[in-house]
Design a protein with these regions (language model features):
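Aromatic/acidic, Gly/Pro-rich catalytic loop(s) in extracytoplasmic/lumenal soluble domains
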Residues: 94-274
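C-terminal region of N-terminal signal peptides and the immediate post-cleavage residues
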Residues: 4-33
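Catalytic lumenal/periplasmic loop and adjoining terminal transmembrane helix
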Residues: 28-117, 190-196, 208-211, 227, ...
Length: 274
């Protein structure tokens, strides 16, 4: 039997086993009514779709059996998934964990306070909420200790970008740069781009629902001079290696044609890495 089929069968079997043993998790807020079950399934589907589209392909993802099944259904490769067993004492070994109600119950507040402080996205509300969390190297304490210095570095890089005569920034983009709210990968790429041509920074954003306030904005819309300028921006991004955006294309907005670009999550906080 093919390896993919074996993995799928394993997920299915362990998912059934997890359901049979759910009573062991006395605090597990498992949905019991048809409406709650439907809501839980919808939250899993939305979270899985977001991960398939927004999370770096190189990242290992921790998930409970049902969530792992939903991720596979969204075409996330089984090789990217690490199933978290009900007996696991901690979520270590993965870079991103899908904090379903079952896993929040299993690890309690330690999930956020010890291991995974950063919320990349969130789906649903109340007890059925699903958070996509980043497991910080060194744990939450180390992560939180680095936040201030990382923001200062992003502010400095933003100031440097704004000082470039080739950069024209909207009020929103200007404010985001000076507040240190822009992803380092965007700062580096836009700095390189501005050395070659004039660019207009329209907006920085992150389309992720429920994203944490400490997560830098990893998307941008960029204007240029005429269609030739936009083509030059696209050509520049295509040629990038280390910092090529995960998604970029030319689109039309109310003010005209722009290039939209976005990096996948999770991204670095500081200019020299995590």
């Amino acid at each position: 039997m093919a390896l993919g089929a074996l993995v799928t069968l394993a997920f299915t079997h362990q998912g059934e086993q997890a359901q049979k043993t759910s009573s062991v998790r006395s605090a597990d807020p498992a949905p019991s009514t048809p409406g709650a079950l439907q809501t839980a399934a919808a939250n899993r589907s939305q979270a899985a779709d977001w991960i398939a589209q927004q999370v770096l392909p190189s990242v290992l993802i921790g998930c409970d059996p049902l969530m792992c099944q939903a991720l596979q259904a969204a075409d996330v490769s089984a090789s990217r998934l690490s199933m978290v067993q009900p007996s696991a004492p901690d979520p270590l070994g993965v870079e991103v964990i899908v904090a379903t109600p079952a896993l929040r119950s299993q690890f309690g507040p330690r999930l956020a306070t010890v291991y995974a402080p950063q919320v990349l996205a969130s789906f649903g509300t109340g007890t059925q909420r699903i958070d996509i969390r980043y497991l910080a190297p060194g744990g939450t304490a180390t992560f939180e200790a680095s936040l201030a210095s990382a923001r200062r570095a992003r502010i400095q890089a933003g100031q440097q970008l704004l000082s470039n005569k080739n950069v024209l920034a909207s009020a929103q983009a200007h404010g985001a740069l000076l507040a240190g709210n822009v992803d380092p990968r965007l700062l580096i790429t836009l700095g390189l781009l501005a050395h070659e041509m004039q660019v207009r920074l329209v907006i920085f954003d992150d389309p992720s629902p429920g994203v944490g306030s400490a997560v830098p904005l990893r998307g941008a819309e960029i204007g240029a001079t005429g269609s030739a300028g936009l083509s030059a921006v696209l050509a520049f991004l295509t040629q990038q290696t280390t910092y090529q955006p995960s998604h970029f294309s030319q689109i039309r907005i109310a003010s005209g044609q722009v290039v939209t670009m976005q990096y996948d999550a999770p991204g670095p906080l500081g200019m020299n890495g995590p």
